[in-house]
Swiss-Prot record:
Subunit structure: Homotetramer.
UniProt GO molecular function: magnesium ion binding; phosphoenolpyruvate carboxylase activity
Protein name: Phosphoenolpyruvate carboxylase
Gene Ontology process terms (BP): carbon fixation; oxaloacetate metabolic process; tricarboxylic acid cycle
Family per similarity comment: Belongs to the PEPCase type 2 family.
Documented EC number(s): 4.1.1.31
Keywords annotated in UniProt: Carbon dioxide fixation, Lyase, Magnesium
Keyword Flavoprotein: no
Cofactor requirements of the protein: Mg(2+)
Catalysis performed (reactions): oxaloacetate + phosphate = phosphoenolpyruvate + hydrogencarbonate
Reported function: Catalyzes the irreversible beta-carboxylation of phosphoenolpyruvate (PEP) to form oxaloacetate (OAA), a four-carbon dicarboxylic acid source for the tricarboxylic acid cycle.
Enzyme class: lyase
Amino acid sequence: MVPRVMSTQHPDNARIPFFAASEVLNGEDEVREAYYVFSHFKCDEQMWDFEGKEADAHIVRKLLSSYYDFFSSRPLGKDFRLTMRVPNPEIEKGEAKLLAETLEMIPRSYDYVRSLGIEHPPIFEVILPMTRSAEEVMKVHAFYRDFVAGKGRFELLGEKVSDWLGDFLPEEIKVIPLFEDRDSLMRAAEISERYAEWAELDELRVFLARSDPAMNYGFVAATIYVKKALYDLSQLGISTYPILGVGSCPFRGGFSPKNLSVLDEFPSVYTFTVQSAFKYDYEFGDVRRAIKRAKEAARRKSDYVDEEHLQVAEKLKDGYRRRIAKIAEIVNRISSRIPRRRMRKLHVGLFGYSRGEEIKLPRAITFCASLYSIGLPSEIIGIAEMSDKDYEAVCEVFKNFDGMMESAMSLFNPESLKIVDLSMDFERAKELFGYEPDERHLEKTNEIIKQIDGDIKNLVVEAGILRGFLG
């Protein structure tokens, strides 16, 4: 059974999880989290992330040794999935050999569960981030098959390696391509089809990012690009099971226990991610009910995206990117005081600016948290470029556009315009979607603005709790 709900480790939560030893989750906290995700939240998949962070390579052993009664009757790989996100050696040269190290986990973990009498591989899929070609996916698949599992066929001093170290199983894995930029999203179907043909697969899981495209191209353009990729995938001659990476912040997808419209917005998506804010910034009962709804959601045909929709996306993307230079200074000024929620390696993204400049910005969660903390929702950036005709075209393909924008606008603080002049964007957004501020959030962001160069960490968290997400 293909999972419907994938829990992830994205650090977008304002509240501290009930099982955490401190406000920054460490490796042991994340092992506990994986158990609670399956046992309490009833998710059917947990992403185990080796990209950009130190992850515990002994996760399978630790889960079974600590929670044997639970997992012995509900085996990993069968009732629940643990799916690793591995580094992409084509992009992350400094982490290239970590790919080999993480793939070695797979047969080692299988050995451990077999020693307990469980005859099912706990891990048999990996996610490849920043996929840009079919060859990248094929290389990971072939490397595991030929050099990880395949080493058992080699001979050492006249003896097969498998006779010495045991079998290396499973013999093959599947690789889930993760598409994160515009060009790869536009080629997602082509790349997926080539990989499926090469690997002789009749079905394939494909992962589409929503957060990084929004960071690079803006809220509306990212949504249209993802919808175009989903439509193209639906036209393939193989069964595809798309995964959509969505956060609770509208800019990053808008999926929360209080907003399940995303299930209808992307009707062909099979698996939705639930990130940390979804799990920890809402009442437990609401989270459980929302996850149940997501697991039961009926799939329908993808929305058709035509050339007019893509032209509007390009226009709004260009408007968004023109404004990034004036936003970067305040984002970087505030970002260092956004509280950390996970033990991650420092990672500063490079935003490719349209005139060849490179503007340094933090990752998407911190970017959004920095702007929301002063009452500047990132969803409005560039919206002044939207004509009435553009608006009508967007509403054709983005069904809950008004609802998402009204939600974002409720968190706007006009005082933020004194820090970053986006007055034209605000006025156009107000004209299209109205402006009814959340008074409690307005008050909290006023406090942050008054103390903007001081110790604002607690205020940032308090504002995040009111929103239902940090960033």
